[in-house]
Amino acid sequence: MWQGRFGYREGIFIIYGLAFVGLLLQVIAGPIPATAFAYPFNLVGGSLLLAGILFWGIFHRRAIRRNSARFSFLSGHIATLTSIGGLLLLAVIMGLTKQIPAEMGRGLQHPIHRLGLSSMLSAWYFLLLYLYLLFVLGCVTTDRLMRLKLNLRDGAFVMNHVGLFIALFFGLMSSADIRQYRMQVYSDSDYPEWRGIDQRTKKMVELPVAIELKKFEIAEYPPKLMIIRNNSGKALPYSRPAHLSIDRTPSKGTIDRWQIEVLAHLPYSAAVVTKDSVVFREFRSLGAVHSARVRAANLDFPQEVVSGWVSSGSHVFPYRSLRLTDSLSLVMAEPDPKQYSSQVYLYAENGEIDSATILVNKPLRYRGWYIYQLSYNREQGRWSTMSELELVKDDWLYGVYTGIGLLLIGAAMLFLGPIPASTQAKREDHD
């Protein structure tokens, strides 16, 4: 071992050594602090990594001239496979272990938390193996660049490896530099909101962009009718609760041996107390609820017929159910949101004002920030006057995109490139 050309034993030993050092650091120092490798420390570390690869390339080139294989291990397939295998093993463990933020695991004495298995991305051994894989990838790419031939296959190899290196390198650089803030804006506020809560420090900070909520809107799925037990509130049947969606009127359906007929549906309504009953009338103002006039007939006992109004309720008006028997009631569940969005005004530091609509799952790109529609006041529902947004900025993101672009170019070059001679010969022999 450690004599002559390095083999798999040496490669695996390096992985074990890095993992052992990482475990010691994890036990002694705890997880990696969130800001430990933020700017400018990530810039210094990244520069040292690139300098190490450059110096390796210089010494490797000198060794080649002297017909020496002293530095060839790091650009060989053994180092590549063992470095990938070590990091892949950690990825499998991470997939099988519930991951929590490193801050939540501090002070917990269970070995899973003490060893960092529950917060793998903040573990020292993960960082060391990631850096080793990145260094090996850089050495492999440098070695190929020194032996580059002007053909499509070599070009594809370089594009793929350079692209992967750039994507992984800038992904590492940005991991501690991503800025995430949560901001709550209100439509009834007279002033825009400049402050956000830093998701790492949990402190309120002023941001270079302000947001004013003009209007919050929700598109909902049709409300659903269900039959529940009065004493437990559980929907029937217990094994697989059924419901009737009010997507049109009139409509009918069967729930647990009750035929339900929807005679009318008012998406915006309020209860009106008459002389002998409660009815619903159209009401397009704050707190308006979905309501439906229904008729329910027991299929086992046709003489049991009940009719009346049901509503989902809101933060202003209580829900209303229809009692079918002493133990059963027909209720309307709150409609599920289909899409929600915020119409906002955006204020920049230089005084410029813009307007935009932020949709859920469709972030808004604004002056280097990604603004996500995160949540709203669930209690108020579609009448929510509050919208919760998340503002994210990653200054290294374009580097990751560049790496992905080079990977795609390399894949296209491989696809369009000529068939290797050995493969072509095999096809001809087969024919």
Where are these regions (language model features)?
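Solvent-exposed, non-transmembrane regions of integral membrane proteins
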Residues: M1-D431
